[in-house]
Amino acid sequence: SAKVMTLAQALGVLLGSAIGSSLTTQLIAFKITDFALVLIFSGACLFLFTKRSRRRSLGQILLGFGLIFYGMFVMSSAMAPIKDYPLVAAMIISLENYPFLAFLVALIVTAILQSSAGFLALLMTLAGQGLVGSYAMIPFVLGAHLGGTITGVLSSLGTPGRESKRAAWANFGFKLINGLLFLPLYRPSTTFVLWSSPDLSRQIANAHTIFSL
């Protein structure tokens, strides 16, 4: 809206941020959230107790990443008791048989969380508890991709310029077409992703990366 970038440049940034989000998911699959407090402590020490600007900048980066991963760790931990509620667990498991419904659930939850990586971190937690089947993975990932664009669309509505609106809606349209194109092909797509790793959390991260490219 500040007319600093053209529409093409803005779309490039949005598509690049999607790839960056997929890298965050890859790090979560590596269980880096277990080291979130270490990152926070290291970043805080570098920022508070050093005078060199480069070290302070590195401290800010580590602190930022640590807080992001700790937030995802807290959200994921909050989902852990779900397996103790049979009705809720059964509803989640049943979504494997209803790919379009799984797509919509992922879209809505991601829009609420305002983060596709955050939703997929929760999905990995549920997968670790055996509540997410392999064939629900692709619909969830596609829904998360589309849901992640909702924040940009809503934010653009309050901006005066047309370029920001066009960029946000173009990003939404691209992800919508991507979802509608691959959702009917979720079974062969799942078969392809299953080859990438024996671990379901890693498969989710790989699917997120593939559909972000």
Language-model-detected regions and their locations in the chain:
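Alpha-helical transmembrane segments of multi-pass membrane proteins, especially transporters
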Residues: A8-S17, I61-F69, S94, A106, ...
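Hydrophobic core segments of alpha-helical transmembrane domains in multi-pass membrane transport
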Residues: I40-T50, G64-M75, V105-T110, N178-P184, ...
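Transmembrane alpha-helical segments and their short flanking loops
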Residues: M72, K83-L95, G158-L213
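Helix-loop-helix hairpins and the membrane-proximal interhelical loops
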Residues: L62-I108, L126
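Interfacial loop-to-helix junctions that mark the boundaries of transmembrane helices
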Residues: Q26-F35, R55, A89-E96, Y135-M137, ...
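A structural-propensity feature for long, helix-poor, extended segments
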Residues: L27, K31-L63, S164-F172, L176-S189, ...
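Alpha-helical transmembrane segments of polytopic integral membrane proteins
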Residues: G16, G20, S42, I68, ...
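Membrane-interfacial helix-loop connectors
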Residues: S1-S22, Q26-F35, F47, T110-G147, ...
